[in-house]
Amino acid sequence: MVQQLSLFGSIGDDGYDLLISTLTTISGNPPLLYNSLCTVWKPNPSYDVENVNSRNQLVEPNRIKLSKEVPFSYLIDETMMDKPLNFRILKSFTNDKIPLNYAMTRNILHNTVPQVTNFNSTNEDQNNSKHTEDTVNESRNSDDIIDVDMDASPAPSNESCSPWSLQISDIPAAGNNRSVSMQTIAETIILSSAGKNSSVSSLMNGLGYVFEFQYLTIGVKFFMKHGLILELQKIWQIEEAGNSQITSGGFLLKAYINVSRGTDIDRINYTETALMNLKKELQGYIELSVPDRQSMDSRVAHGNILI
């Protein structure tokens, strides 16, 4: 369990390249491309559960978020085949269109490998050409983040994905004078589940939870001093009726630091200072602010929100 201190901001699509250069200069580190498929689960409404704890205190039921990385081969189409998988590829995701669909995510949840065709059409000559070009670029600019590359798996499979991460979060701390958002988060890793035809879906159903909604995040991360992490991301809500990009026309920026102990006041104050220094450094370019705490409330009584 950690205390996560954070600030949020946004930029338009046209400011992406400049922000990448700025954050690279500030952090001294290259951006790392990542993705995360997030599924949100709520208590099964057909179960009658007493919402009280061992002290007979009323406890509101919370949602649980499960997230994992999926192979990038599930996320790119034919128009991106010849592009290296680095931070530049994010500029190609400008609309709602994305190969990952509702049926594929259902297969992932039920531990079935989704059927993808985009990488099957890639020939070996194209791969060799791309790697040769990347090698030349890397040798020419060994310290330049522009040439940082990350290859997707040529043979996508569900088994190659990272394990599921299970997260439960509290509503951020209240207070009108807070300079940063502070939220308690408990997280663990699901390495495996037992039983016949086991899957994360059957595991959650066994715990008394049912699927509610899901979304996909694709972005880049910067690792900075003082344990500060910056995420620049695009978000899609994935529904049976189709996908929709929530961040259409721009990017969401999240700056956060995790503090391992909520009672470590000195560390919390130090972390808050680090975030405020970043806010001051980016002032006039990006306005980092504290979001509405209701938008980060995972309690079931507060509607379908992204957490």
Curated annotation (Swiss-Prot):
Effect the entry attributes to changing T22I: In SRB5-1; suppresses the phenotypic defects of an RNA polymerase II CTD truncation
InterPro entries in the cross-refs: Mediator_Med18 (IPR019095)
Pfam families membership: Med18 (PF09637)
Compositional bias segments (type: Polar residues): 117-126
Keyword Oxidoreductase: no
Record key words, sorted: Activator, Nucleus, Transcription, Transcription regulation
Location of this chain's protein in the cell: Nucleus
Biological process terms in GO annotation: cellular response to heat; positive regulation of transcription by RNA polymerase II; positive regulation of transcription elongation by RNA polymerase II; positive regulation of transcription initiation by RNA polymerase II; RNA polymerase II preinitiation complex assembly; termination of RNA polymerase II transcription; transcription open complex formation at RNA polymerase II promoter
Region spans: Disordered: 117-162
Gene Ontology cellular-component annotations: core mediator complex; mediator complex; nucleus
An annotated Gene Ontology molecular function: RNA polymerase II core promoter sequence-specific DNA binding
Family the entry assigns: Belongs to the Mediator complex subunit 18 family.
Function of the molecule: Component of the Mediator complex, a coactivator involved in the regulated transcription of nearly all RNA polymerase II-dependent genes. Mediator functions as a bridge to convey information from gene-specific regulatory proteins to the basal RNA polymerase II transcription machinery. The Mediator complex, having a compact conformation in its free form, is recruited to promoters by direct interactions with regulatory proteins and serves for the assembly of a functional preinitiation complex with RNA polymerase II and the general transcription factors.
Binding partners and assembly: Component of the Mediator complex, which is composed of at least 21 subunits that form three structurally distinct submodules. The Mediator head module contains MED6, MED8, MED11, SRB4/MED17, SRB5/MED18, ROX3/MED19, SRB2/MED20 and SRB6/MED22, the middle module contains MED1, MED4, NUT1/MED5, MED7, CSE2/MED9, NUT2/MED10, SRB7/MED21 and SOH1/MED31, and the tail module contains MED2, PGD1/MED3, RGR1/MED14, GAL11/MED15 and SIN4/MED16. The head and the middle modules interact directly with RNA polymerase II, whereas the elongated tail module interacts with gene-specific regulatory proteins.
Comment field (misc): Present with 1011 molecules/cell in log phase SD medium.
Record-linked PANTHER family: MEDIATOR OF RNA POLYMERASE II TRANSCRIPTION SUBUNIT 18, MEDIATOR OF RNA POLYMERASE II TRANSCRIPTION, SUBUNIT 18
Protein's name according to its UniProt entry: Mediator of RNA polymerase II transcription subunit 18
Gene name per UniProt: SRB5
